[in-house]
Amino acid sequence: MKIKLICVGKLKEAYLRDGIAEYQKRLSRFCQCDIIELADEKTPDKASHAEKQQIMAKEADRIKKKLGQRDFVIALAIEGKQLASEQFSHLLSEVTVKGYSDIAFVIGGSLGLDQSIKNRANLLMSFGLLTLPHQLMRLVLIEQVYRAFMIQQGSPYHK
């Protein structure tokens, strides 16, 4: 199985890079986990709605180039479905049973995701109504992916 985390924006903080690298290493015994960073567009102060839509559309074009036609796409969006860790683990297991070998998680930029990406997604997923920095969300997501595999293994990590 191959998991891709497609993220808009560059990760700047060393402590987040270190945490993500640790979980990538842990995940390597279960799957290949690639993190793909895409350039984000600069958002001008007081950007109009139309300008924001253009920015999200440009970022969406970059995202689409990294999505495979046969990827199971999970886009993170505040309006998405909230899952408990056990449900998330079951979902990842079910995705592979259905014949998908590649799962792509998409984290948008500071403005969120363009509707075209949400439409392409097999699932919109939310980690709740909290607002988190997109860079921190990468660490939270990769930890939950690792946790999902540990749940499948019956590991005490989840306790």
Curated annotation (Swiss-Prot):
<feature type="binding site">
    <location>
        <begin position="127"/>
        <end position="132"/>
    </location>
    <ligand>
        <name>S-adenosyl-L-methionine</name>
    </ligand>
</feature>
<keyword id="KW-0489">Methyltransferase</keyword>
<dbReference type="GO" id="GO:0070038">
    <property type="term" value="F:rRNA (pseudouridine-N3-)-methyltransferase activity"/>
</dbReference>
<comment type="similarity">
    <text>Belongs to the RNA methyltransferase RlmH family.</text>
</comment>
<keyword id="KW-0963">Cytoplasm</keyword>
<dbReference type="GO" id="GO:0005737">
    <property type="term" value="C:cytoplasm"/>
</dbReference>
<feature type="binding site">
    <location>
        <position position="76"/>
    </location>
    <ligand>
        <name>S-adenosyl-L-methionine</name>
    </ligand>
</feature>
<dbReference type="InterPro" id="IPR029028">
    <property type="entry name" value="Alpha/beta_knot_MTases"/>
</dbReference>
<keyword id="KW-0698">rRNA processing</keyword>
<keyword id="KW-0949">S-adenosyl-L-methionine</keyword>
<comment type="subunit">
    <text>Homodimer.</text>
</comment>
<dbReference type="Pfam" id="PF02590">
    <property type="entry name" value="SPOUT_MTase"/>
</dbReference>
<dbReference type="InterPro" id="IPR003742">
    <property type="entry name" value="RlmH-like"/>
</dbReference>
<feature type="binding site">
    <location>
        <position position="108"/>
    </location>
    <ligand>
        <name>S-adenosyl-L-methionine</name>
    </ligand>
</feature>
<dbReference type="InterPro" id="IPR029026">
    <property type="entry name" value="tRNA_m1G_MTases_N"/>
</dbReference>
<comment type="function">
    <text>Specifically methylates the pseudouridine at position 1915 (m3Psi1915) in 23S rRNA.</text>
</comment>
<keyword id="KW-0808">Transferase</keyword>
<protein>
    <recommendedName>
        <fullName>Ribosomal RNA large subunit methyltransferase H</fullName>
        <ecNumber>2.1.1.177</ecNumber>
    </recommendedName>
</protein>
